[in-house]
Curated annotation (Swiss-Prot):
This is Rho-related GTP-binding protein RhoU. PANTHER family: RHO FAMILY GTPASE (PTHR24072). It is a lipid-anchor. Residues 29-45 have a biased composition (Gly residues). It is found in: Cell membrane; Golgi apparatus membrane; Cell junction, Focal adhesion; Cell projection, Podosome. There is a cross-link at K177, K248 (Glycyl lysine isopeptide (Lys-Gly) (interchain with G-Cter in ubiquitin)). Changing P80G: No effect on ARHGAP30-binding. Interacts with PAK1. Interacts with PAK3. Interacts with ARHGAP30 in a GTP-independent manner. In its GTP-loaded conformation, interacts with ARHGAP31. Interacts with PTK2B/PYK2. Interacts with PAK4; the interaction is PAK4 kinase activity-independent and protects RHOU from ubiquitination.
Length: 258
């Protein structure tokens, strides 16, 4: 297989948040409704919360997506992710929404630990690399069954990562050596329909093409799902029709273990 862009761990010092990150209040399981990691979904004065979990094979670029989206930077060194959480406040129709991004490990050795991060997930970003046919194959063979086992109703957005490598000559040569080709966009769209994903989006963490669209779609789908969970017998709340820029007030990172 060709060399893959990876999921480097979020650097502790090199990528400083705009404002020093706040400490999470409370111990494990002690966060209240609306707090990242909290069990409640309701908002309150600080705004509502959306929990977004990124899953997919190792080295498909999950962490790169998060780092690029949250810092406008791109990590160059590949360090396999264990479990990391990132939290931010974003503005949706003028109202604050606390977005929790849970970056999970795709390696098989974490299969038993990974589902611990799935509790109260509002939206899954199921990632595969468009230049890794094996990671695409695992979408339906491994990841969808795992998600549906633990979160039968949570929405999924299928994300094709590393789209900037589709035309990369070195990558194409390496794929050809294995008698493989990049995953056709049409095949990915068909897969999204088959797994009943909310949508399919191709993006690049390096160039940031369609990167914001991925997380905007995740926030909208997460809010819709959260509303149905809170008010199953009432009509759905109005879907935000305009996604506003990410609030630059503060970012924070904390451990995902529960």
């Amino acid at each position: 297989m060709p060399p893959q862009q990876g999921d480097p761990a979020f650097p502790d010092r090199c990528e400083a948040p705009p404002v020093p990150p706040r400490r999470e209040r409370g111990g494990r399981g002690g966060r209240g409704p609306g707090e990242p990691g909290g069990r409640g979904r309701a908002g309150g004065a600080e705004g509502r919360g959306v929990k977004c979990v990124l899953v997919g094979d190792g080295a498909v670029g999950k962490t790169s997506l998060v780092v690029s989206y949250t810092t406008n930077g791109y990590p160059t060194e590949y360090i396999p992710t264990a479990f990391d959480n990132f939290s931010a406040v974003v503005s949706v129709d003028g109202r604050p929404v606390r977005l929790q991004l849970c970056d999970t490990a795709g390696q098989d050795e974490f299969d038993k630990l990974r589902p611990l991060c799935y509790t109260n997930t509002d939206i899954f970003l199921l990632c595969f690399s468009v230049v890794s046919p094996s990671s695409f194959q695992n979408v339906s063979e491994k990841w969808v069954p795992e998600i549906r086992c633990h979160c039968p109703k949570a929405p999924i957005i299928l994300v094709g990562t590393q789209s900037d490598l589709r035309e990369d000559v070195k990558v194409l040569i390496e794929l050809d050596k294995c008698k493989e080709k990049p995953v056709p966009e049409e095949a990915a769209k068909l897969c999204a329909e088959e797994i009943k994903a909310a949508s399919y989006i191709e993006c690049s963490a390096l160039t940031q093409k369609n990167l914001k669209e991925v997380f905007d779609a995740a926030i909208v789908a997460g809010i819709q799902y959260s509303d149905t969970q809170q008010q199953p017998k009432k009509s759905k709340s109005r879907t935000p029709d305009k996604m506003k820029n990410l609030s630059k007030s503060w970012w924070k990172k904390y451990c995902c273990f529960v």
